[in-house]
Structures are given as structure tokens and as C-alpha cells.
From Swiss-Prot:
One of its GO terms (biological process) is carbohydrate metabolic process. GO terms for cellular component: extracellular region. SUPFAM superfamilies: (Trans)glycosidases. Residues 30-311 form the GH18 domain. Residues 1-25 form the signal peptide. Keywords: Glycoprotein, Signal. This is Concanavalin B. Belongs to the glycosyl hydrolase 18 family. Glycans are attached at residue 309. InterPro entries: Cts1-like, Glyco_hydro18_cat, Glycoside_hydrolase_SF, Glycosyl_Hydrlase18_Chitinase.
């Protein structure tokens, strides 16, 4: 009887260690994205030089629609109409980031601004504008003469017209016609389906989905409780078309940047959250941080990288008990 009990204990320990090894392998390739575009964020080139990020979202193109003559790029305190300083000086920094292997996306929408995809015809015009002035280097646009790596749909404002699927479809067709390599991504809220982007997501044209797991108590992390975020993640793995490693968790880099909650300390993210997310091995690609300023203040991305580079054994005891 004693030998059987010891054998059972050994089997359990082996299972736990194999689970831990697999989980660590799954998250060790974590890619980090960050939103950049405020005065306190520092220089774009310096953001890329940290080597912490694989993707930078220039945020935001947040003024466009049928009643707006020309789309406007507003980088708070950096450049744009409110500052009275054009953003074309960023051209050299964008290209420097790209030479370093950092993908630079243009983020549409955001929490402020005035924007809408007000009709199917306007969606087509906007797609052509984005391709001409941001994605092709064909003409000098608000960021200079650039070919950005992608367009990011960060739609957070209630509008009557929801033609985001039309805009996505037009961009996808442009990509096909010109044999372009630019990427398309979205940042829906953690509650699935997303009220603004669900139709667009169902087109299956997004390369990456960055799910916002904050400012929504129904599906975000709270201290010591991962059940809501786990359930939301599972819902997204089922509702989003299967594509290898195309789901990111978008998280606040500090408590202050998410007044509605959802902040996850780096140690808890690596030790208590990620290892318990379903389909991690096939669907998880990394995390996105809101925003660069907060990351500078807290060192969130640096801590994530430090934990990933370590053996992570300090967190083993946390894995022996499923968090509530």
C-alpha cells in the first residue's frame, strides 16, 4: 500500500512538472506590443531601442468620418492639429524602428476623438487613403513617406454606423491587389462578441486579435481570481477563427491607466494567469500594453522579460494550486 501511494505521488509530481514545463515553453516566446503617442512616452526610436517590444501602435488616427473633410492624426503632446506641429518628423524614427525589427502599426480610433466608418462608400475611400498615405510610401502623408507594417482597429466609441467590416474588407482587397505584406489587427473588449468589431472579426481577415482585458469587471482579472479572465479567454479561442498564435492579451501597464480595474502584476501574470489559459500552446502570441508612459514608470515589460528569462521556479508553488 505504501509503495502504491508513493508511486501515485510520484506520478502527480511528474504531471505537475510536465505541465509547468509545457506552460513555461508556451509563454517563453511571448511577444510584447505597446501603444505609443503621448508626450510622456518619449521618442519613438527610444521606445524601439529598449528591445522590449515587437510591435508599436502609433496612437491614434482618431478624427475621420463622412462629415470630416480630411482624417487627422492626433498624438497628444507630440504632434498633430492641437499641437500645431506636423508628425512628418517621425518618418525617420519609424524607419529606424523597422530596421531594428520592430513592426510599426497605425492605430485607428481609441478612447477619444471623433470617428466613424459612416458608410460602405466612405469605408472604401478611407481604405484607399490609408494605403496611399500610410502603407505604401507612394505619397507623403501625416507621418512622412512611410510604409507602416499594419493597421490596428481600436474602436471604443459608440457610433450609429458600424461599417468596420467594410473598411477591413477594403483593406484586405487592397492587400491582395498590391500583393502587400501589411498586417491587420483589432483590439476588441474582453466580452465576446465585441459590440463594435464582431462583424469585422467574423470576416477572418484580421491577422492578430488583441483582446482588452481591463476596464470591464465581467471578464478581467482581480487579485487572486483568474476565473473571469480565463472564461473570457476561452470564449475568444472558440469564437475567433483558429489561426496559430494570433491572440494577444491587452493589459494595463499600471493600475492608474485602468481606473476600471484589470491590472495584473507581472509576477501574477507569468505565474498565476498565463499557465492556466486554455489553448495557450496553439493560440497565445503575447501581450499588448496600454501604454508606453505607464510602462516606463512601472517597468512592466522589463519585468515580464526578466521573469521569462528566469527559470520561473519561484512561481512553481503557485502552480500547485489552481487559483480561485
Amino acid at each position: 500500500m505504501g509503495c502504491e501511494r508513493k508511486a501515485l505521488i510520484l506520478m502527480v509530481v511528474i504531471w505537475i512538472m510536465s505541465f509547468w514545463t509545457l506552460s513555461l515553453a508556451d509563454i517563453s516566446s511571448t511577444e510584447i506590443a505597446v501603444y505609443w503617442g503621448q508626450r510622456e512616452d518619449g521618442l519613438l526610436r527610444d521606445t524601439c531601442k529598449t528591445n522590449n517590444y515587437k510591435i508599436v501602435f502609433i496612437s491614434f488616427l482618431d478624427k475621420f468620418g463622412c462629415e470630416i473633410r480630411k482624417p487627422e492624426l492626433e498624438l497628444e503632446g507630440v504632434c498633430g492639429p492641437s499641437v500645431g506641429n506636423p508628425c512628418s518628423f517621425l518618418e525617420s524614427q519609424i524607419k529606424e524602428c523597422q530596421r531594428m525589427g520592430v513592426k510599426v502599426f497605425l492605430a485607428l480610433g481609441g478612447p477619444k476623438g471623433t470617428y466613424s466608418a459612416c458608410s460602405a462608400d466612405y469605408a472604401k475611400d478611407l481604405a484607399e487613403y490609408l494605403h496611399t498615405y500610410f502603407l505604401s510610401e507612394r505619397r507623403e502623408g501625416p507621418l512622412g513617406k512611410v510604409a507602416l507594417d499594419g493597421i490596428h482597429f481600436d474602436i471604443q466609441k459608440p457610433v450609429d454606423e458600424l461599417n468596420w467590416d467594410n473598411l477591413l474588407e477594403e483593406l484586405y482587397q487592397i492587400k491582395d491587389v498590391y500583393q502587400s505584406t501589411f498586417l491587420l489587427s483589432a483590439a476588441p473588449g474582453c466580452l465576446s462578441p465585441d459590440e463594435y468589431l464582431d462583424n469585422a472579426i467574423q470576416t477572418r481577415h484580421f491577422d492578430y486579435i488583441f483582446v482588452r482585458f481591463y476596464n470591464d469587471r465581467s471578464c478581467q482579472y482581480s487579485t487572486g481570481n483568474i476565473q473571469r479572465i480565463r472564461n473570457a479567454w476561452l470564449s475568444w479561442t472558440k469564437s475567433v477563427y483558429p489561426r496559430d498564435k494570433n491572440l494577444f492579451l491587452e493589459l494595463p501597464a499600471s493600475q492608474a491607466t485602468a481606473p476600471g480595474g484589470g491590472y495584473i502584476p507581472p509576477s501574477a501574470l507569468i505565474g498565476q494567469v498565463l499557465p492556466y489559459l486554455p489553448d495557450l500552446q496553439t493560440r497565445y502570441a503575447g501581450i499588448a500594453l496600454w501604454n508606453r508612459q505607464a510602462d516606463k514608470e512601472t517597468g512592466y515589460s522589463t519585468n515580464i522579460i526578466r521573469y521569462l528569462n528566469a527559470t520561473a521556479m519561484p512561481f512553481t508553488s503557485n502552480l500547485l494550486k489552481y487559483p480561485s
